[in-house]
Amino acid sequence: MINVLAVASEVYPFVKTGGLADVVGALPAALAAHDVAMRVMMPGYPAVKAALGAAPAVHHYAELFGGPATILAGRAAGLDLLVVDAPHLFDRPGNPYLGPDGKEWPDNWRRFAALSLAAADVGRGAVPSFVPEVVHAHDWQAALAAAYLRFTYGERARSVVTIHNLAFQGSFPVTIFAGLGLPPEALAIEGIEYYGGIGFLKGGLHYADAITTVSPTYAEEICTPGSGMGLDGL
């Protein structure tokens, strides 16, 4: 049996804006038949915390990208969950990425860097009751976990980044780099730098131990200049 932590910004049936949520929600049951014990990490949106109910905190942060936070462990809808409870980042109206005005939250970089860092911390043994051998990050919102893990000195989980939709890459101004907590050498073409800015997905793909996508056909397509969205060379 291998322990795997799946990390995603949305998971069915709690929060869904697209197919990503369906895939991540179905993976644990599908992989259990292959001797994989999977827990799912996701942000502590109001709907997630309501479904989880009273759940113990298994890790505490005095400060996580702007405020205190905890990792909650529990079970809901047949899924074993680790939830990043950071109200300053995730207790908001709207969908996971947009406010009620339909615009992206200006601190989305901070919100999903926090999710990624929490996943990496679990991959470094922060939750003794569940130490994964693999951290499986889905799309740009979780991809930076691979970068945080790569800059770990000591025991760590291996990282897998899965691309569901290459059109969404998590691109931000270079000015956010200092707030990510990564070492200076990460700000490079052979790192998370992307056309003068920061690319969460690009950085995750660069630092991941393995990369997968949703089908063999899509894997071939995104390796071509026409469909690679600027990342085909990577």
Per-segment meaning from a language model:
Residues M1-L234:
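Catalytic cores of nucleotide-sugar-dependent glycosyltransferases that transfer UDP/GDP/TDP-activated
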